[in-house]
């Protein structure tokens, strides 16, 4: 009763396209388009999306370049679903001829737009060709990107509220957002430094969890780097901190130690999920060398433990070998550098004081805050030094040029208590030189401000300038007297103190020799040479200091460009040499600034194009990483020219592993009908693979894809008419609340009642089909599938009278494809032969007889009668004749 399986010949509309091992045959209708062969394109294929691809020419965007697919039609796992059906069907049933993007992701259709190469100066901003670069991103950096975007989005929301905002109010908003960005950067630095120190990154990063200690590919990649340590330190005992015991490094270091005959000690953290295989590996490593496994708390103090256990050994060197640890180290270094750039930008453009053309020394000191911390940490690690050592004085000089006044005073106090200092000559004020220096530094306005005002505004405009000028004059007077007193025959100036004195006197040569960076040189000139509060004078000072540097770095050039107002050049340099996020968020704040790169506060910014470009590039780079797709699309939605199109392209090319994720993408990001339909089709692919045929059909109905619904319906009628599918189909129809299951299928009569029957309900996830609703009346195969399901239900319920009426109505309305006529007519024989009831009237019987004669006289009768014997047809003829006679008598 339920087996409608006529033979499918080579010219039939095959759901998957007629596929052979090396070639796609002609005249095939491929369900999801994209016909291809190993060397040439197939003729007469029904390609839904237009265009075709060969194995050697699969151009993603239609302009330049090519992508090789390498027999891509056999890379699909979907092909495995139909192996069982190949015995029934003459031609192999394959589901989908794949084309692929360069990253191996599914590519369903050609891009909507060609994104040619653009530059910063384009009128409409523009963007580069879509890139597909899959990057491994640290979990902490992902969180950092999310925090950056939160602030970015807030800025866009505020900027979009009103274009007539008071310029000074906008400056204050931008200043606040600049400080927020900086706090996000500093928080990321602190968090990553803490994770690095304690080893908690092992629990946070995907690369450290569920890793394989015998991953041959990773071992092959890391071997040259680890081997270099053994070659570089052949005579030392190396202590390797390996991260997790589950990583490759305990095994790799042990193996290389045996090969190079070097001595090494391995320290690793315990496994999160120990198993027998790892335990065997640990025993093997322990037998080859020394392995120490620490718990989480112990590993956070690994350096102390290493010192306690191995501190007495000679020529010991500790090394962090874990690549994730080193990745953290690189990111921290980058963030430190980027935070300094941000501080300099904030100094000139984003602080409220910069808009009033004034700066304070504390703002300059903020620019080298991380340098100061690094210097203080290095001094702390070195421990207490001998005050009699000349290096002690050099240390004080370095602290002084960094503006660490409190630490300098502390060091001088220690020095004053040393025996040698007690015998120092007295100045005219009867104080030792060290005490003189302490008094001078204690009176510096920088300290007075922190004590009195706590960063508050001065009482009158030139208060700070007057205070600093007075301090400079007093310093010059006192220290000049000290040097003059040391020039006599009885007194001598302490040579160790002389560099410190010269720095306080503003000696440029001494300052330059002591400073380690460009910004330290600028800060020293402000503090000890010529104090200024003018932004204009500060810009000039930046230029002067830059000219004194013999070999300026790229970072120094970027600092200078901030001072010279060449913001387009600045942003290009940052974009070229720094992570893209820095240029993007700087350009955004500068773009919204009413006094930067604008003729008038409310006029269009000259940075519009470069901001557009940077947003586009950054959004694409994020969206290329599937784990950052959402945030990448968030940025792209603010790209005015082509942003939504780029989102559609990225969304449509995302591999869909879970239906929930697809629904989320549809709900949040898919903006065009083409993108939604491509996702529906990918979901249909997945459900077909899982043999969820009703759900697969439902996705195609959501996509309003009539041609594919026809092909899928035909396939299901030929191969999958089992009770499980019919039950699923019933469930599908019940979930679509506007389906009229009693459809009048006479499409030739233009019945108004039937033309209004649409599927517009919800799928399994309550997703609404928008304006693109599917018309059931446009698809006769689906109508027959639905009506045939009704027939099955009536038969199972033993409602034979209703069954016969419905069947005759279907024959009358020509709903049933001719290849199924004989099978359905033969299924009626038990009802025709019934002795108790008359199920077919006289008119019904004549209709069935005419259908039988029509199919017998058809030139395709041999095809329609496949697997049906002549005896079955004769039995049907006799049953119809007897029923006709019975109907006349009745």
From Swiss-Prot:
Sequence repeats lie at residues 16-17, 32-33, 49-50, 61-62, 618-619. Transmembrane segments: none annotated. Residues 59-86 are annotated as: Disordered. InterPro entries: Nucleoporin_Nup85. GO terms for biological process: mRNA export from nucleus; positive regulation of DNA-templated transcription; protein import into nucleus. Residues 16-619 are annotated as: 5 X 2 AA repeats of F-G. GO terms for cellular component: nuclear membrane; nuclear pore outer ring. GO terms for molecular function: structural constituent of nuclear pore. Residues 59-84 have a biased composition (Low complexity). Residues 719-752 form a coiled coil. It is found in: Nucleus, Nuclear pore complex; Nucleus membrane. Its main location: nucleus. Keywords: Coiled coil, Membrane, mRNA transport, Nuclear pore complex, Nucleus, Protein transport, Repeat, Translocation, Transport. Component of the nuclear pore complex (NPC). NPC constitutes the exclusive means of nucleocytoplasmic transport. NPCs allow the passive diffusion of ions and small molecules and the active, nuclear transport receptor-mediated bidirectional transport of macromolecules such as proteins, RNAs, ribonucleoparticles (RNPs), and ribosomal subunits across the nuclear envelope. Due to its 8-fold rotational symmetry, all subunits are present with 8 copies or multiples thereof. Component of the nuclear pore complex, a complex required for the trafficking across the nuclear membrane. Belongs to the nucleoporin Nup85 family. Contains FG repeats. This is Nuclear pore complex protein nup85. It comes from Dictyostelium discoideum. The gene is nup85.
């Amino acid at each position: 009763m339920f087996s409608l399986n006529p033979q499918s010949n080579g010219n039939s509309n095959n759901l998957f396209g007629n596929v052979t091992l090396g070639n796609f045959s002609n005249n095939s209708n491929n369900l999801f388009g994209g016909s291809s062969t190993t060397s040439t394109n197939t003729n007469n294929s029904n390609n839904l999306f237009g265009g075709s691809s060969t194995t050697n020419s699969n151009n993603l965007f239609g302009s330049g370049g090519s992508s090789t697919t390498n027999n891509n039609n056999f890379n699909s796992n979907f092909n495995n679903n139909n192996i069982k059906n190949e015995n029934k069907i003459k031609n192999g049933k394959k589901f989908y001829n794949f084309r692929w993007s360069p990253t191996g992701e599914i590519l369903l259709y050609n891009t909507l737009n060609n994104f040619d190469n653009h530059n910063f100066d384009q009128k409409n901003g523009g963007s580069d060709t879509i890139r597909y670069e899959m990057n491994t991103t640290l979990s902490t950096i992902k969180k950092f990107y999310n925090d950056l975007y939160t602030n970015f989005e807030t800025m866009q929301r505020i900027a979009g509220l009103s274009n007539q905002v008071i310029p000074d109010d906008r400056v204050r908003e931008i200043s606040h957002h600049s400080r927020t960005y900086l706090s996000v950067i500093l928080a990321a630095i602190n968090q990553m430094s803490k994770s690095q120190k304690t080893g908690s990154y092992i629990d946070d990063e995907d690369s450290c969890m569920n890793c394989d200690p015998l991953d041959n590919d990773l071992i092959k990649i890391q071997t040259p780097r680890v081997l270099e340590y053994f070659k570089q330190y052949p005579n030392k005992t190396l202590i390797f901190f390996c991260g997790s015991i589950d990583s490759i490094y305990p095994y790799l270091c042990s193996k290389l130690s045996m090969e190079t005959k070097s001595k090494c000690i391995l320290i690793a953290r315990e496994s999160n999920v120990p198993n027998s295989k790892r335990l065997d590996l640990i025993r093997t490593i322990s037998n080859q060398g020394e392995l120490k496994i620490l718990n989480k708390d112990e590993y956070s103090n690994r350096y102390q433990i290493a010192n306690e256990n191995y501190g007495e050994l000679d020529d010991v060197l500790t090394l962090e070998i874990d690549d994730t640890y080193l990745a953290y180290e690189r990111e921290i270094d980058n963030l430190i550098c980027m935070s300094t750039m941000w501080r300099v930008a904030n100094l000139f453009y984003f602080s409220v004081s910069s808009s009033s053309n004034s700066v304070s020394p504390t703002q300059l000191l903020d620019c080298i805050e991380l340098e100061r911390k690094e210097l203080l940490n290095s001094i702390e690690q070195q421990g207490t030094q001998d005050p009699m050592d000349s290096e002690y004085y050099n240390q004080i000089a370095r602290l002084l040029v960094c503006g660490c006044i409190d630490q300098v005073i502390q060091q001088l106090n220690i020095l004053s208590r040393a025996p040698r200092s007690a015998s120092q000559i007295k100045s005219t004020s009867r104080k030792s030189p060290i005490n003189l220096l302490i008094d001078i530094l204690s009176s510096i306005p920088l300290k007075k401000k922190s004590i009195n005002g706590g960063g508050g505004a001065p009482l009158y405009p030139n208060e700070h300038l007057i205070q600093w000028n007075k301090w400079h004059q007093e310093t010059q007077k006192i220290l000049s007297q000290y040097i003059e007193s040391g020039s006599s025959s009885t007194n001598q100036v302490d040579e160790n103190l002389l560099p410190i004195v010269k720095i306080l006197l503003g000696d440029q040569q001494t300052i330059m020799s002591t400073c380690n960076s460009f910004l330290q040189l600028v800060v020293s000139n402000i503090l000890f040479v010529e104090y200024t509060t003018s932004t204009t004078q500060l810009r000039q000072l930046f230029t002067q200091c830059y000219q004194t540097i013999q070999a300026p770095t790229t970072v120094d050039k970027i600092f200078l460009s901030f001072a010279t107002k060449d913001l387009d050049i600045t942003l290009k340099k940052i974009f070229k040499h720094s992570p893209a996020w820095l240029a993007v968020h700087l350009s955004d704040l500068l773009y919204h600034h009413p006094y930067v790169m604008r003729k008038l506060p409310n006029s269009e910014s000259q940075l519009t194009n470069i901001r557009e470009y940077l947003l586009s590039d950054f959004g694409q780079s994020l969206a290329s990483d599937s784990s950052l797709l959402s945030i990448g699309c968030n940025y792209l939605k603010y790209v005015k020219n082509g942003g939504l199109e780029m989102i559609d392209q990225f969304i449509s090319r995302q591999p869909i592993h879970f239906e929930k994720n697809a629904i989320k993408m549809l709900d949040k990001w898919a903006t065009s009908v083409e993108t939604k339909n491509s996702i529906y089709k990918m979901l249909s692919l997945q459900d077909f693979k899982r043999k969820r045929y009703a759900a697969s059909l439902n996705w195609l109905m959501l996509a309003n894809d009539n041609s594919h619904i026809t092909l899928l319906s035909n396939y299901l009628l030929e191969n999958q008419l089992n009770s499980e599918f019919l039950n699923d189909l019933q469930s599908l129809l019940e979930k679509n609340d506007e389906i009229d299951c009693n459809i009048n299928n006479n499409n030739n009569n233009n019945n108004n009642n039937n033309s209004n029957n649409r599927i517009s309900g919800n799928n399994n996830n309550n997703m609404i089909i928008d304006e693109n609703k599917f018309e059931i009346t446009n698809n006769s195969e689906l109508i027959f599938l639905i009506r045939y399901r009704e027939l099955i239900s009536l038969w199972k319920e033993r409602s034979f009278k209703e069954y016969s009426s419905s069947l005759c109505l279907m024959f009358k309305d020509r709903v049933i494809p001719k290849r199924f006529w004989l099978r359905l007519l033969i299924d009626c024989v038990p009802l025709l032969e019934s002795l108790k009831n008359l199920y077919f009237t006289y008119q019904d019987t004549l209709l069935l007889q005419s259908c039988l004669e029509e199919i017998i006289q058809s030139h395709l009768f041999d095809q329609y009668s496949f697997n049906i014997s002549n005896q079955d047809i004769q039995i049907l003829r006799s049953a119809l004749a007897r029923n006709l006679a019975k109907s006349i008598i009745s």
